[in-house]
Amino acid sequence: LTQDHVDYHKNFKNYLNAKLYLFQNLIKKGGIVVTDDKIPEFTKIKNISLKKQLKLFTLKNKYFQILSHNYKNEAQILKIKHKNLIHEIRVNLVGKIQLKNILMAVIAASKSNLDLKKIFSVIPRLSSVEGRFEKIGKIKNKSLVFLDYAHSPDALQTCILNIREQFSDRHISVLFGCGGDRDKGK
């Protein structure tokens, strides 16, 4: 959890409890949970999953393994191993953070018995969500312009680090604003 939405929940404890409510009360026995084992809340999610007999999957699992990751201009090339088959996938999204979301979606889809061949064929056609690493243009000096509504210190840092990693050979300029008075702690 980050500072995002704490203004609504009043404090981190309430925010965490609202998130855990999803696992404790809304997922039925035998349901699927796909999560990141690197988040601080993982142990709590794991314990709830064990208690409720939920099927827990993380990014580190025996079903999918990322073999390699490379950048190719504005795209990312992923090699994923699944059941002794290697799939090379072009991801036309900026930001390494996007890969985590894609892999979790692939795991969830696979565990929901959706056709992986179709899923892998659709990934190259994905485009950014409006306001999330969204390419909005190019200026005269050939600089790329991206829009991201990162509005917490953690989100802004993740955004900048992802852009820097993918475009390490380019100069990066950042323009950000903090409008509104809803959560002055941000």
Question: Where are the predicted features?
Answer:
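Nucleotide phosphate-binding/pyrophosphate-handling subdomain across enzymes
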Residues: N73-E74, H82-K186
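A short helix->loop->beta-strand "cap" motif at the edges of active sites that frequently abuts
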Residues: L26-I32, L50-L54, R170
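Residue-level signal for inorganic ion chemistry
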Residues: Y15, V34, I66, N101, ...
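Short, charged/polar "capping" segments at the starts of alpha-helices
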Residues: I39-K44, Y63, R182-G185
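Flexible active-site lid/hinge loop adjacent to a nucleotide/diphosphate
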Residues: L1-K46, P153-Q157
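Extended acidic/charged loop-beta regions that coordinate divalent cations
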Residues: L1-Y8, Y21, T43-E88, R125, ...
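Generic beta-sheet signal
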Residues: D36, L56-K60, L175
